Structure formats: structure tokens, C-alpha cells
């Protein structure tokens, strides 16, 4: 009899403790020792958690790399107007990084800390991003009309002040909510009877959306402010306005979809379990919109010089002084080389080799035309004075029996001067150029 009673008690234990077995049952992909709070991070049956954290992890890495690139490109930014926006853009990247991190708080099951972080950081992080867009749009409206905008610290201060407004709103809302209900929440997120509708996890979906009205106002301001930038006089700033406009249009579409789903769709289909996936997907989608349509295009444009700087670079190119430059200038001067085959003998002192660097003083050299004797002879009498025209050779200027039979330029010049001093009989000066190597 005792054996039968013991057997019945062992078989009846599972019937009396079904809750204990249910608590030890872990979803596929999760360890039995894992806290049930983190089951969505590894649950393969509901893949939305794994996909969301994978997308958020890739976004965190991408945003971190883009932040490093933007900060490292600061010394290479030549346009001072773009450099003044770097502080605001880094602030925008920090807000985007926070949105990717907040995705994990939405994947984890509701708890007092996770619910409080969602309620507070959701609006603050979006306010950071949209405030930076509003400040950028404000600067672009000045740049497209005057090609000169506010200082960098002014733009950053505008973005910071707009963000502080949302910080104050969320802080007051969260404090009032917690103090009024005492914040009594069970470890698994089950709200006690004394704190119903007063804890962060017990806030209605409609109330959560209503607390984001200021953030929606910032988004609408950035969207409307981006349109005038497309009509400015300075067209090179229009593409930045297009980046902001495209980002805000997609963000508005994302916000409309998730708000409708969060406040109306889930209640109509009686699926409150889709509240967390809705927030996680909205965060990841909007953060990637910021990265793809605003951050990456702005980073690619930040180091490009302004048209004024490009024009100055073309007008005043950098020119180095070196051996190659001297050779090019000497080559340019060699186009007027004297033909030595038809030149007369010159004194030996004139034939000394001259260094190509003797006349170089560090400045740009110019080619100087030095005509030869043959060129002067072919110019004619009307182009120069009579005393520079080379004389013709005569039989009286040189003794045929001398040892040196070469005509010297000095003797020819003396004979020619004598002939010029004796005018012709008709009283006119006539210049007859004869071959100096043919005797009269």
C-alpha cells in the first residue's frame, strides 16, 4: 500500500505544479538559465527581436565610424561655412547613435527601468536629431540667399536649446507619473493594483504619443524650412537642402505609419504584444534614414572646396622652383638659337661657355629675343639705324697676301663707315646689300 501511495504522489506532482514547469521552459534559441526579461533577444520563434538587434548593431557600428570620419576630416575642410556646421552634425550623429541603442530597450521585455528609458529617451533622442535639422535648415536659408550664414556656435546653440525644451517636457512628465503612482512595479513588469495607469509601463499608447507633440513640431518645422533653400540665389547650397528635405519626408512617412499602428492597429486586432516591435522597428528605420539620406551625403560633401577657392587655385597654381622648371625655361629660350654656320668670327672672349644658371635669380624668367647679324641684314634700312647695319666686304679692306685671309668685322665696319660718309652723286642714300663673300 505504501508503494502505491508513493507512486500516485509522483505522478500527481506535475498536475499540482504546472506553473513551475512553465517558468523553466525557455523559447528555442535561449538558455534555460537566461532571465525571461531577455528572451526576445534570442527567441527564434519570434524573429523580430533578433532582426531588430542585428539591424541596430550594424547601425551602431556605422554611426560610430561616420563620427570618427567627420571629426578626422576637420583639418581638411577648406570651406569655413561648412566647417561651422561640423559641431551640429556631430551632435546629430550622437542622437542617431542613441536611437540605435534604444532599440535594445524596446526588444527587452517591459520592466521599470526599460519602460522609463523608453518614455524619456524616445522623445529626447528624436528631439536632438530634428533640432539639428532645424538649425541646419536655418543656416541654409541664409547661405542660399547671402552665401554667408550664422557662426558655428550660434547654430549649435539653437540646436541645443531646442533639445532642452523636450528634455524639460519629458522630465516633468516622467516625474509626475512616477510620484503620483509611487512607481510600484513587479520585477516582471506586472503593475500592482495601487499603481495602475501611473507607472511608466502602464502609460496608455495614446498618452505616449501625445507626449511627443513637440518632437512632431520640430519635424514639421524642418520639413517646411527645407523648401525655401531650393529657391536661393546661390545654387551650390541647394543640394544640402535636398538632403534635409528627403530625410524629413521619409521620417514623416515613418512616423505616420508607426503612430497609426501603435495607437489604432494593435488595439483593433487585439495584439498588444506588437507594441514593442512597433517601437523597435520605428527607431531602427528612422535612424537608418538619418544615416543614409543625411549623414553619408553630408560627410561626402564636407571636404569639397567652394567654387571661389577652386577659381583661385586655377588662377594662381602652385609652382615649384627646381631643376625641371629651369630646363623648361631654357628650352623655351632655345627657339631663337643663332645659326653659327653663317655668322662671322667673333672675339674669343665672346665664345666662353655661359652657365644656364648664371642669370637665374629665383624669379620667373622670360624669353628675350636677340637677333643675329643675318637677321639684322634682312630687316631692311627702314627698321633700324644705319650705324647698326653690317657693312659689305670690299677688296680694299683686306690685303690678299696676308697670312689671315678671314675678313674681320672691325675692318668691314670701318670701310662701311667711310662709304656712308661719302654720299652718292645723286644726293640720295641707297643701301645695296651684296654678298660679302663675292669680291667687287
Swiss-Prot record:
This protein's name: G-protein coupled receptor family C group 5 member C
Protein keywords: Cell membrane, G-protein coupled receptor, Glycoprotein, Membrane, Phosphoprotein, Receptor, Signal, Transducer, Transmembrane, Transmembrane helix
Location (main, coarse): membrane
Glycosylation sites per record: 190
Signal peptide: 1-22
Key word RNA-binding present: no
PTM sites of type Phosphotyrosine: 413
Transmembrane segments: 50-70, 85-105, 120-140, 156-176, 208-228, 241-261, 279-299
Organism: Mus musculus
Positions carrying Phosphoserine: 343, 382, 402, 405
Family, per entry: Belongs to the G-protein coupled receptor 3 family.
Gene Ontology biological process: visual perception
UniProt membrane topology term: Multi-pass membrane protein
GO CC annotation, single: mitochondrion
Function of the molecule: This retinoic acid-inducible G-protein coupled receptor provide evidence for a possible interaction between retinoid and G-protein signaling pathways.
Phosphothreonine: residues carrying this PTM: 422
Cytoplasmic side: 71-84, 141-155, 229-240, 300-440
Extracellular side: 23-49, 106-119, 177-207, 262-278
Stored CDD domains: 7tmC_RAIG3_GPRC5C
Signal as UniProt keyword: yes
GO molecular-function terms, A-Z: G protein-coupled receptor activity; sevenless binding
Amino acid at each position: 500500500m505504501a508503494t502505491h501511495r508513493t507512486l500516485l504522489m509522483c505522478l500527481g506532482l506535475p498536475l499540482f505544479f504546472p506553473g513551475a514547469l512553465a517558468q523553466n521552459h525557455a523559447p528555442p534559441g535561449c538558455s534555460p538559465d537566461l532571465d525571461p526579461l531577455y528572451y526576445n533577444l534570442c527567441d527564434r520563434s519570434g524573429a523580430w527581436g533578433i532582426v531588430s538587434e542585428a539591424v541596430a548593431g550594424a547601425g551602431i557600428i556605422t554611426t560610430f565610424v561616420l563620427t570618427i570620419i567627420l571629426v578626422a576630416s576637420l583639418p581638411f575642410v577648406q570651406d569655413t561655412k561648412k566647417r561651422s556646421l561640423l559641431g551640429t552634425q556631430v551632435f546629430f550623429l550622437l542622437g542617431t547613435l542613441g536611437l540605435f541603442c534604444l532599440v535594445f530597450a524596446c526588444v527587452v521585455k517591459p520592466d521599470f527601468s526599460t519602460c522609463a528609458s523608453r518614455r524619456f529617451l524616445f522623445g529626447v533622442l528624436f528631439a536632438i536629431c530634428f533640432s539639428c535639422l532645424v538649425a541646419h535648415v536655418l543656416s541654409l536659408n541664409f547661405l542660399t540667399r547671402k552665401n554667408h550664414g550664422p557662426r558655428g556656435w550660434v547654430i549649435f546653440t539653437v540646436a541645443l536649446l531646442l533639445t532642452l525644451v523636450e528634455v524639460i517636457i519629458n522630465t516633468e512628465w516622467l516625474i509626475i507619473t512616477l510620484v503620483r503612482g509611487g512607481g510600484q512595479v513587479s520585477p516582471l513588469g506586472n503593475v500592482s493594483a495601487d499603481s495602475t495607469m501611473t507607472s511608466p509601463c502602464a502609460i496608455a499608447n495614446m498618452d505616449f504619443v501625445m507626449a511627443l507633440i513637440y518632437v512632431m513640431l520640430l519635424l514639421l518645422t524642418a520639413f517646411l524650412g527645407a523648401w525655401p533653400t531650393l529657391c536661393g540665389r546661390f545654387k551650390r547650397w541647394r543640394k544640402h537642402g535636398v538632403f534635409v528635405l528627403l530625410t524629413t519626408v521619409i521620417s514623416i512617412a515613418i512616423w505616420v505609419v508607426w503612430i497609426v499602428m501603435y495607437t489604432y492597429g494593435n488595439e483593433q486586432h487585439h495584439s498588444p504584444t506588437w507594441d514593442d516591435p512597433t517601437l523597435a522597428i520605428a527607431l531602427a528605420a528612422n535612424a537608418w534614414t538619418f544615416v543614409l539620406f543625411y549623414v553619408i551625403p553630408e560627410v561626402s560633401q564636407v571636404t569639397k572646396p567652394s567654387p571661389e577657392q577652386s577659381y583661385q587655385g586655377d588662377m594662381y597654381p602652385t609652382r615649384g622652383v627646381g631643376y625641371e622648371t629651369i630646363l623648361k625655361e631654357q628650352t623655351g629660350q632655345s627657339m631663337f638659337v643663332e645659326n653659327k654656320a653663317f655668322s662671322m668670327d667673333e672675339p674669343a672672349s665672346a665664345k666662353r661657355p655661359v652657365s644656364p644658371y648664371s642669370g637665374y635669380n629665383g624669379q620667373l624668367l622670360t624669353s628675350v629675343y636677340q637677333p643675329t647679324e643675318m637677321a639684322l641684314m634682312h630687316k631692311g634700312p627702314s627698321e633700324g639705324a644705319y650705324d647698326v647695319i653690317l657693312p659689305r666686304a670690299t677688296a680694299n679692306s683686306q690685303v690678299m697676301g696676308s697670312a689671315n685671309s678671314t675678313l674681320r668685322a672691325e675692318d668691314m665696319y670701318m670701310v662701311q663707315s667711310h662709304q656712308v660718309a661719302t654720299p652718292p652723286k645723286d644726293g640720295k642714300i641707297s643701301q645695296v646689300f651684296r654678298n660679302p663673300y663675292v669680291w667687287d
